[in-house]
Amino acid sequence: MEVRLADCAGFCFGVKRAVDTVYEQLKNGKTIYTYGPIVHNEEVVRELAEKGVRVLESKEELKNLKAGETIPTVIIRAHGVAEEIYDIMEANGLECIDATCPFVKKIHRIVEQKSTEGYHVIVVGDPKHPEVEGIVGWCQGPVTVLETPEQAENFVKTEGEKLCIVSQTTYNYNKFQYIVEIFEKKGYNDSVVNTICNATEERQRSAKTIAADADVMIVIGGKHSSNSRKLYEICQRECEHTYFIQTLDDLHLDLPKAVRLVGITAGASTPNKLIEEVQNYVRINF
């Protein structure tokens, strides 16, 4: 039996950069907070909590954090935040370490500029995802979040209105293209910017390729990880026996007979050591 790992699995550039930033700041002996969990992976967050890193879960908690004898350090995670969050930190005298993914920062600049120029911004993505909430928070005018093709079909723009369409970096690439086609048929393609991260596209393509050939597919990722859930959806369409796990303890394989290939992929917030644990476990026990 072969165990094959997808080419693009585990920490992406932005997540690794954010996690490394937290560990670097810990070396300085500071009081460290992250605005929201640094990554959507409970194991990583738990390890950092054991080292004293605290998580600010809401804007209200951030507002209540003020500089005293010491100046708290707040790290912005890779998902990025709305412009308002920076203003709160500055007003409260907090030290801000910005670990926003550069690809997300680029979207902030695009929507800020386009909305200032009078465009109605369309963000394709999950309205409850922190990255999308951050993007919306940089728009200076009308903004609409669309998550499904059905919502795109039902969207009607105001006559004479210009649209700028962007995407959550981890959105399903094929679904984004389909939504863009819907807008093009309506004549709503004034400004379309594919802001899906290249690593996300490659991760999804790689997972789909392996899943199409695999008898069993394992997707490793946090239960709150948007990109991990999308990987699971993609793999499940290609491979009937697809498992979505957060840790090795979640893995209860019921393998079909005559398994040739077990494929493994992982979300952008999944640490390499966890991927290796799952790989080794499958190789040894099956």
Q: Whereabouts are the PLM-identified features?
A:
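The feature marks the mature, well-folded catalytic cores of soluble enzymes
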Residues: 1-286
